């Protein structure tokens, strides 16, 4: 099954939850333990003191990985000067596992699409290899989050690839290739305003606004019934109304 066959509303909801994941990562950027826990403890313990840079939706040729986490190692025993993690996030309504990736057609399509995204994104860096530069450890990771509560259900960390790259050049490449609209959204400090802006960005806000509130619908229905009653009374024959009035008077 291809993900292109999913309804547009499901894709928009997925985009909305991606933005929520990005916001959480930014909030944990200064806390290695919380960031590592949120992403499945994929970072080794020797990077606890590393400086962390985070980039979102970086365009690398035909591919746009969801998130790139760049860690500058300060461990003198580390064979790599830099560790670069490419993340692909998938969100699901229900729980996802390795078993569901094999048997659930949607989870399987998400997983395979994520693998292609990661593979091609990392391969894009090969054109910038420099023989006498420092060694990088480039690691692809795919994560499945449940939309309710942003719970990490399942992740897969793949073997890293060694590449020799210029830190200043690659860091600048990542920074300038980020999606500007996403950066603007993530800069909103207030969470309520951020949530509303994300809904508007993903077109969810306008879809919900098209539905009139229930109270408005009830009020409108009542008004219509009152108008209908008045119209019936207006159209009724006058002599019939008078006879009815006389009968009511006699009963009294």
From Swiss-Prot:
Coiled coil (residue ranges): none
Instruction: Name what induces it.
Output: Expressed late in the infection cycle.
For this UniProt record, give its keywords in alphabetical order, as a comma-separated list. Answer: Host cytoplasm, Host Golgi apparatus, Host nucleus, Late protein, Virion
InterPro entries per UniProt: Herpes_UL24
Region described as Disordered: spans on this chain: 215-252
Q: Where in the cell is it found?
A: Virion; Host cytoplasm; Host nucleus, Host nucleolus; Host Golgi apparatus
Q: Which GO terms describe its cellular component?
A: host cell Golgi apparatus; host cell nucleolus; virion component
- Where along the chain is composition biased (Basic residues)? 237-252
Output the Pfam families linked to this UniProt entry: Herpes_UL24 (PF01646)
Q: Give the protein family.
A: Belongs to the herpesviridae UL24 family.
The free-text function statement in the UniProt record for this protein reads:
May participate in nuclear egress of viral particles. Plays a role in the dispersal of several host nucleolar proteins including NCL/nucleolin and NPM1. Since deletion of host NCL/nucleolin negatively impact on nuclear egress, UL24 supposedly acts on this process through its effect on host nucleoli.
State the protein's name: Protein UL24 homolog
Organism encoding this protein? Human herpesvirus 6A (strain GS) (HHV-6 variant A)
Where is the organism placed in the taxonomic lineage, from the top?
Viruses, Duplodnaviria, Heunggongvirae, Peploviricota, Herviviricetes
Q: Which gene encodes it?
A: U49
């Amino acid at each position: 099954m291809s993900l292109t066959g999913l309804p547009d509303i499901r894709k928009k909801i997925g985009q909305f939850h991606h933005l929520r994941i990005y916001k959480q990562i930014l909030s944990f950027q200064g806390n290695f333990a919380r960031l590592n826990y949120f992403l499945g403890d994929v970072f080794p313990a020797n990077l606890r003191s590393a400086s962390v840079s985070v980039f979102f939706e970086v365009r690398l040729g035909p591919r746009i990985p969801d998130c790139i986490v760049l860690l500058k190692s300060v461990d003198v025993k580390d064979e790599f000067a830099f560790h670069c993690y490419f993340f692909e996030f998938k969100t699901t309504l229900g729980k996802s596992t390795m078993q569901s990736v094999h048997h659930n057609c949607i989870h399987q399509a998400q997983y395979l699409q994520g693998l292609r995204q990661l593979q091609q994104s990392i391969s894009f860096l090969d054109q910038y290899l420099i023989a006498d530069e420092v060694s990088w450890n480039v690691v692809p990771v795919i994560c499945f989050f449940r939309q309710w509560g942003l719970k990490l259900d399942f992740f897969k960390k793949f073997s890293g690839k060694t590449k020799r790259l210029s830190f200043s050049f690659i860091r600048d490449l990542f920074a300038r290739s980020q999606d500007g609209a996403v950066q603007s959204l993530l800069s909103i400090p207030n969470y309520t305003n951020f949530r509303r802006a994300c809904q508007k960005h993903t077109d969810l806000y306008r879809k919900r606004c098209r539905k009139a509130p229930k109270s408005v619908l009830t009020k409108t229905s009542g008004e219509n019934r009152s108008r209908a009653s008045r119209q019936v009374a207006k159209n009724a024959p006058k002599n019939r109304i008078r006879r009815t009035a006389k009968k009511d008077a006699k009963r009294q």
